[in-house]
Each structure stands twice: as structure tokens, then as C-alpha cells.
Amino acid sequence: MDGTPKLACPWDRTEESLGNVVELQHVNLQVPDQLKATAFYISALGLTRDPYLMTGIDNMWANVGISQFHLPTGPAQVLRGTVGLVLPDRAQLLHRLDRARRWLEGTQYSFTEAEGHIDVTCPWGNRMRCHAPDADRLGRITLGMPYVELDVARGTLPGMARFYEQMIGTSTAMRDGALYVRVAREQFLIFRETDKPQPAFDGHHIQLAFVDFGGIYNRLNERGLISREDSAHQYRFIKVVDPNDGRVLFEVEHEIRSMKHPLFMRPLVNRNAAITNNYYAAGNEAAVWAMPPA
């Protein structure tokens, strides 16, 4: 209007928008046996026990890139779906998985090779899909948790898209018959419909961080969806509902943190799982979770 010419923009600026959800920090699953959990998450998968927090014998935080598994002691909880992991070396992973059999006999532990991934089942039935790094499909990471895929009932995806778009304020997209909900720069919740009967929700949770922490709280609270008030920095909800009619579509606990939470984007230690006392090179103990510049 002032005569200044409008600059042509060669980029789609909306591609850089994350919306209100900026972190998928952890998946929390109770485990009945910390030794077996260590054998699976640390020795078999090659993840890193958090050296600073939860260092006792009744809980373990296992680092995978910028995300974690939280593994408190209790009756086993099973996610109704699959946790996607990126791990840096397929051959080394297979070697670790094979060696871990000796510690995990008599449990549900198993693994199966497939083209492009390895499917792994934890001692209590949780499913992991382990991928090699792939920037085009999984983002520019060499170690991490790019997605959590959840099995849901037929006919629920349109309502779930409305919930995450209208109530939470993040973007969604349909890909290969599944609903992808963006929950961080290169992380997604994936909802995939199934005809298989699903067990009742058993209390496991995922943790997200919201930009509009208070605004989303108000929208959820107006519908009676807040399930727990944890602190000034944190609340929880369980029910995913269709905003159009209030119908409950799915249940999984969402632990929600603000960007002012003391643990938001806390840097995590990741080890190079290829290093052993017999196969060692100084200066190579730490793993880098992100790819170098392209």
C-alpha cells in the first residue's frame, strides 16, 4: 500500500510451522523387572541409561537421541501399537539382539528381520520397529524416536484429526491410510485403524510439550478432559474425543509440559553402542544423534 514492491518468496513458509506441539520427550511403560529391562533397552537395543536422573533400582530412564523411555517398576504396561526407533547400525543391532537372548529366555522377547527394518518385541510384549537412518523418511537423525504408532478402531481417524487440529492446534495428514499428527520437528504420533480387538487402556503414557500450554488447557478443561493436575508446569489428559460430538475415540495418557518446565529440551547423553572394553577407540564413546550438514 505504501508502494513498496512485494518480494517473491521461493519457499512454502508453512512447511516451517510446528504448531502448538514441539516435543515428544518420552514414552512411559511400567516394567516388572529392572534387570530384564536393562538387558532389553540398554544391552539389546543399545540405548543409554540416563546417568543423572532416576539412578535407583525402581525406575530407569533410557535415552534414545533427544527422547527417552521411562521405565518405572510396576505391573507390565503394553502400548497398543509400535514405537519407531532409528538406530545407527543394523548389523551391530542384530548382534546385540542375538546376544540378549540368554538374558531374556522365557519372556515375550523376539525379533524379526524385514526389508528396511527389524521388528523387536520387549520381554512384556511392547513392539518396537527399528530403522536404519533415512533422512527422507524419518528425518535427519541417526538415533531417535521418530514416531509412536497407535492402533485405533475403524472410523475414528476423521474425528481424531479434528481433535488434534482444533483442540491441540497441530497439523495432521493422511499417509498410507494412517493419520500422522506432528508432535515435534521430525516426530509424529501415527494412528492406524485396525479390526483387531484392542485391550483396555492400562495407564501407559506419552509426554508432549505445548507452546500454548494455557490455551490448550482451557479448551480441554472446558470439556472435562483434564485427568490430572501435576504442577504449574504440567497436566495430563487421557481421552481423545471428536470435537463435533464429544465421542471418545481413543484413550492414552498424554503428559503435557510447558516450555517453561525445568526438563524441557534437557540435553541427553547418548553412548556409542559399538564401543566395548574389547573394541574401543578413545574419543568415540559418545553418539551423535543428528546427521551432519547435507
Feature-to-residue mapping (PLM):
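Minor-groove-contacting beta-hairpin "wing" of winged helix-turn-helix DNA-binding domains
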Residues: 58-62, 179-181
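Conserved active-site tyrosine of GNAT-family acetyltransferases
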Residues: 37-42, 125, 159-167, 220
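Vicinal oxygen chelate
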Residues: 1-20, 22-32, 50-51, 60-67, 72-151, ...
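Solenoidal tandem-repeat scaffolds enriched in leucines and small polar residues
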Residues: 152-157, 161-162, 168-173
